[in-house]
């Protein structure tokens, strides 16, 4: 092999893989958005033309006169690559009548939402858009930043990005951001460039210093084919080693191992863009200079013979509309199958939001993937919003509302309420603006919590329709070219998915219905029962923690999000919480049950009913207070157990936080998946495991994680003892680890006082009166009952 195991071990750090704060973001105010190191789209024609030809040999204008019978690994090249396509699509990506230029009828039903099957998309053609794609508007185009040039003109109605001529005159506008497909070639020279990477390659004038790569026992020329274009409005990329390719219409698959790796990206995005900064920086032409950049040009996996597929529309930093992104993933795979060849196996890989996508797509599109390797996992996005909302409500209570109470001055005590990890003495908080050894604004001593280090910034991003990072290139583009549209756009997770959740009939501004709810939640219940907090502290917490005001009433964020004035300090988004109303009992927030039902019906909730071999890789990041906590793989397993009664297809492999351990673990997972699928049964060595630094196996077996899913004392298996699993705020309130209750069923407070909910505690008449003020009308959560929003016919 050209690449050795020690080189694979030296792959990118976890930070580069995750990029949940964009591309190596350092600014804490950019949490969960994207940090664009590329230029803003919408530049002059001269600059975008240059951007599209700076690297590789573009074949966008190449034509093939050859006519051959399609064979495995090739496609029918009998087409020219001008703006008239042969698949019944126009250059703006819209579907036509399904009749090709040679008269062949291509009308077929597909599950991509289109009326025709428009694949393959050849060089010079623009990929299709599914008929039921909601075509969100505004929609920032990023093709120029990625290296595909200005997008195609698709309207003269001044909608979208203005497309400029040679003298910067406006020729038209692009709303759908289509770009013609192109293929670039790169190669590894015998003497690699300083810093590694590849060099541009011209297949019609090949250099004489191409390195050789051993694949399948044969030496192959190290030449990479890199195809990019737009499908379903998003930019896709497909790369594979193609040693002898000379015609982009006929992919050379002689070095392919017959496996497709679909790499899914993470991050938290709220839509209205073709690609976030994270996605741009994985698809740009110049990524050939970065040999270990996760994405389509990741050399270690190419060197093993994998073809790699990627799309800006399967990066959750772009959008969390998993209905749309799943549709896009299916279409990208169709392009691969039509242009290249149906793979023997398709493996999923991705961290964070990339892990979520694998689970959701295995559920909603079971034919897309054969094996899953989710890392830094969550069950889904929508049930994570529940915990995200709790974090700032609780931190504001600890810091401000009850900030004088010494109970909350230790981080360990806060953890008893939040459930997530917190560390007294933790150093290096991203939110320590004043260098005090703790997050600025905190009433506690030195230290921090996962609520802050992992989740701070997600509340304004996901919940406030008025706030968006206008410095991110996508949103700066919209603000520059369509300021009125920008001002009228609601920037929230739910509004990005308004076609799923529907418009809230109570909103005068047309905002989407929401799924967030904390009615009846008894924050800190477990801490109360274990004696960690007093009855008076429990009562005060639940009276004052509150919820969120209606989106119609929300105001712009303070410093450091919306306002740049430190005197307007509000890291908790407290101005948009009901605690700010100053009432004796701060009102809770109630979900729209119709929105919750749509979340289930439309496949946004991971239900656990999948049978794909799944190996969850969990870097143990609790000491870093990272948002990717150790509870999540076990929430996945619990949902599988609840759905199927077993989870034999699911493995949990924990590794250290050392970045060098990550990709070797992924390689082992791929080998295990291949053996599993080849034999059509689970290998005997496919077991739960945990490793320490250097990928040193510590323990494996069915009891390795004993205790992680139980509450029995002294029941921890060796892996659970090595890597402790924490909980979250709703588990502290009585929910189980599956974390899938949007709106709890409630029982009357009088019932709770009598049925043992409070253990052996006794309450005075004044204390009962105080509890009645909080929970008398709503009751308290009864987590023995299912989610009120879960449809009975699901």
Where are these regions (language model features)?
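Ser/Thr-rich, Pro/Gly/Ala-heavy low-complexity intrinsically disordered linkers and tails
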Residues: 18-113
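C-terminal His-loop and adjacent cap/lid subdomain of alpha/beta-hydrolase
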Residues: 111-794
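Sec-dependent bacterial lipoprotein signal peptides
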Residues: 1-18
């Amino acid at each position: 092999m050209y690449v050795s195991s020690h080189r694979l071990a030296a792959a990118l750090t976890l930070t580069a893989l995750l990029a949940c704060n964009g591309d190596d973001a350092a600014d804490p105010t950019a949490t969960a958005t994207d940090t664009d190191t590329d230029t803003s789209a919408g530049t002059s024609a001269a600059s975008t033309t240059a951007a599209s030809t700076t690297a590789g040999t573009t074949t966008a204008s190449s034509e093939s006169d050859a006519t051959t019978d399609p064979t495995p690994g090739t496609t029918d090249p009998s087409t020219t690559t001008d703006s008239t396509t042969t698949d019944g699509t126009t250059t703006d990506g819209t579907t036509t009548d399904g009749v090709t230029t040679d008269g062949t009828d291509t009308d077929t039903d597909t599950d991509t939402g289109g009326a025709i099957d428009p694949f393959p998309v050849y060089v010079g053609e623009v990929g299709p858009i599914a008929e039921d794609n909601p075509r969100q508007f505004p929609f920032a185009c990023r093709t120029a930043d990625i290296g595909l040039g200005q997008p195609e003109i698709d309207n003269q109605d001044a909608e979208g990005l203005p497309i400029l001529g040679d003298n910067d005159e406006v020729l038209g506008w692009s709303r759908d951001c289509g770009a013609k497909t192109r293929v670039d070639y790169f190669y590894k020279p015998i003497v690699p460039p300083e810093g590694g990477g590849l060099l541009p390659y011209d297949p019609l004038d090949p250099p004489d210093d191409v390195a050789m790569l051993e694949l399948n026992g044969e030496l192959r020329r190290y030449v990479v084919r890199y195809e990019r274009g737009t499908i379903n409005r998003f930019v896709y990329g497909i790369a594979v080693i193609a040693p002898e390719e000379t015609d982009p219409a006929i992919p050379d698959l002689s070095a392919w191992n017959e496996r497709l790796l679909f790499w899914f990206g993470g991050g938290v995005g709220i839509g209205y863009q073709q690609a976030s900064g994270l996605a741009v920086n994985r698809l740009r032409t110049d990524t050939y200079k970065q040999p270990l950049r996760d994405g389509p040009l990741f050399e270690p996996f190419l060197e093993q013979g994998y073809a790699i597929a990627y799309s800006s529309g399967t990066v959750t930093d772009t959008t969390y509309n998993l209905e749309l992104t799943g549709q896009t993933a299916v279409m990208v795979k169709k392009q691969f199958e039509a242009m290249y060849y149906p793979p023997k196996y398709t493996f999923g890989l991705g961290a964070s939001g990339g892990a979520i996508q694998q689970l959701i797509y295995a559920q909603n599109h079971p034919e897309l993937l054969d094996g899953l390797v989710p890392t830094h996992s969550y069950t889904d996005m929508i049930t994570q919003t529940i915990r995200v909302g709790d974090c700032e409500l609780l931190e504001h209570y600890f810091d401000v509302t009850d900030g004088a109470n010494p109970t909350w001055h230790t981080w360990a005590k806060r953890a008893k309420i939040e459930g997530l990890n917190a560390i007294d003495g933790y150093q290096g908080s991203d939110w320590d603006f004043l260098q005090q050894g703790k997050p600025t604004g905190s009433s506690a001593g030195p230290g921090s919590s996962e609520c802050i280090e992992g989740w701070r910034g997600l509340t304004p991003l996901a919940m406030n329709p008025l706030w968006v990072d206008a410095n991110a290139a996508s949103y700066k583009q919209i603000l520059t070219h369509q300021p009125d549209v920008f001002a009228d756009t609601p920037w929230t997770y739910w509004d990005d998915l308004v076609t799923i959740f529907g418009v809230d009939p109570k909103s005068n501004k047309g905002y989407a219905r929401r799924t967030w709810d904390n009615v009846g939640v008894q924050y800190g219940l477990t801490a109360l029962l274990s004696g960690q907090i007093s009855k008076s502290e429990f009562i005060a917490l639940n009276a004052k923690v509150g919820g969120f005001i209606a989106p119609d009433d929300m105001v712009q964020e303070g410093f450091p999000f919306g306002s740049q004035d430190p005197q307007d300090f509000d890291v908790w988004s407290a101005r948009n919480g009901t605690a700010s109303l100053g009432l004796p009992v701060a009102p809770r927030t109630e979900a729209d049950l119709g929105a919750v039902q749509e979340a289930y019906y439309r496949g946004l909730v991971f239900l656990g009913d999948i049978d794909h071999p799944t190996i969850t890789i969990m870097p143990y990041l609790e000491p870093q207070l990272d948002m990717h906590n150790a509870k999540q793989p076990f929430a996945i397993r619990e949902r599988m157990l609840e759905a199927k009664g077993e989870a034999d297809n699911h493995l949990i492999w924990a590794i250290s936080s050392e970045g060098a351990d990550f990709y070797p673990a992924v390689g082992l997972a791929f080998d295990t998946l291949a053996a599993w699928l080849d034999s059509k049964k689970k290998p005997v060595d496919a077991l739960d495991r945990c490793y320490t630094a250097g990928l040193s196996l510590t323990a494996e077996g069915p009891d390795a994680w004993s205790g992680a899913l139980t509450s029995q004392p002294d029941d921890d298996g060796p892996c659970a003892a090595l890597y402790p699993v924490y909980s979250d705020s709703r588990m502290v309130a009585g929910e189980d680890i599956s974390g899938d209750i949007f709106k709890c069923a409630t029982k009357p407070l009088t019932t709770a006082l009598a049925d043992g909910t409070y253990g052996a505690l006794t309450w005075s008449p004044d204390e009962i009166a105080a509890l009645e003020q909080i929970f008398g009308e709503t009751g308290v959560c009864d987590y023995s009952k299912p989610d009120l929003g879960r449809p009975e016919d699901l």
